[in-house]
Amino acid sequence: MHYVTEASYIDGYRLRIRFEDDEVRVVDLSEHLDGPVFEPLKDLPFFRRFTVNHDIDTVVWPNGADFSPDFLYEIGESDSEPVHPADTVGRRG
């Protein structure tokens, strides 16, 4: 089972997500915004309002939408680019 430790916005509906194993994956959610809970995420300014909820170890939005960390890991593509601190949410200080 995976969990999200950090996430940053790239562009469109793409996020760069770091998981507990330090694997960084680029996740494109553009094809996964079906259903009433995900409808608000189609609005890019709203989509960009995600945070990392460390109680459930995944990315969440203000309306309660979230994706399973295992699903995010599965659909993500490995990425060697560093996560830029200014754009990152979720790090514990």
Please give the residue ranges for each predicted region.
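Motif-centric detector for short Cys/His coordination patterns
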Residues: 1-93
